Amino acid sequence: MNAPGNIASGGTKRFQAKRDAILAAAADAINEQSAKGMTFADVARRVGLNTTSVTYYFKRKEDLAAAAFEQTLGQLDAMLDTALEEATPEARVARYLNINMERLARIRRGDERDFAILSDLRAMEDPVKGRLLTGWRNIFRKTRSLWGAGASRAETDLFGARAHVLLENTFWLTAWLPRYEVDEYPRVEARLMEVFRSGIAAPGQDWRPELLDLVHEEPEPGREAFLLAATRLINELGYRGASVQRIASELNVTKGSFYHHLDAKDELVIACYKRSFDIIADAQRLAESHEGSHWQRLDSTIATLLDYQFSERGPLLRTTALSGLPPQVRSTMIDRSNRIARRFAGMLSDGIAEGSIRAIDPLVASQALMALQNAAFDMRKWASTMPREKAVAFYASTLAYGLFDDRALKG
């Protein structure tokens, strides 16, 4: 006969294995549909259970989403602990990137499941939301510590910008890495690390951007203010978290007025994306018509978009809203994003030929630039603690000159 302890141990292992399977299925559902869009029925179907069986492990859908997010935070924490074992900031960043790339290779080969993306954290309800955001802030601080303790407030601010750009670039990998064969991942990793190590500007190229005269108006009166308010809410609460009622109340209009502008909520997020992509493309076009080197055109584009993100005119819509969209619409939005990235790649290629930009992989570097300008919205509070020009220079320096270059501190 089995000893009682062995039976209990076996039961605990079975319980844990089933719980882990439910969490993995929940992560897939969150990544496809967002936390708000995830249902018990869908998660149950993915693991071959009925809905009642799932509630044995997690009483409420919110509990399941929170557990999936906590698992992600735990994995990020462990990855950072491993990276922190290295002796220098550069070695730590290289190790952290390598851990991420190897994890994504295992996922691509089917050897591992992905964890839940964290874009819906702010759409959760308190007290769970407070606990999760505290966990996220701890991850941010630990990432910042890859560069050690800042000797001054300015150094801490710069390390914070570097941490954010590193995290966002590793999160953004899932959007563009599938365009490569899995056996190319080591080469892509090396090329991205080159950008992190030395930046995109060639030696001797200074940071002297000219802010471009970026003016964007929607053809219909009132639509620009409407889309701007919707973009802010969707960035803060996620696509599913920003209800039509909430957007309407933010603008102090009725739900009927909302439907005067757009027929459905999917149309709203598509319109917000179109507005954001149009603004980025406008900046690229304006820069290309300017005098100066290709680096000067690129640094003006980056500075203009970051200034826009940090100002009251912004933000641009975060790509995190993609997880709430129907697959076909999401694919269309990613295609537009990739066209914009290819335009950045063209600017980089011209600069490489000219000698004003380092000999880097322009396709890889262009996606790093997409992550940089896309994620800047989250750093608005950080940027508000210093002059705008300084915030833009600090944040842009992370890719202009790399994650280990301190010249922005002397500016």
Question: Each predicted region: which residue ranges?
Answer:
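C-terminal peripheral helix-coil segments that are non-catalytic and often amphipathic
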Residues: 1-6, 141-149, 153, 175-228, ...
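Generic hydrophobic, amphipathic alpha-helix propensity
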Residues: 18-27, 43, 68-72, 76, ...
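Helix-turn-helix
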Residues: 21, 29-63, 67, 229, ...
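Hydrophobic alpha-helical connector segments
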Residues: 67, 81-110, 159, 271, ...
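Amphipathic alpha-helical packing segments from all-alpha helical-bundle domains
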Residues: 77, 124-151, 160-164, 171, ...
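Amphipathic alpha-helical segments used for helix-helix packing
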Residues: 92, 101-130, 144, 309-328, ...
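Short, well-structured alpha-helical segments
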Residues: 94, 156-167, 299, 303, ...
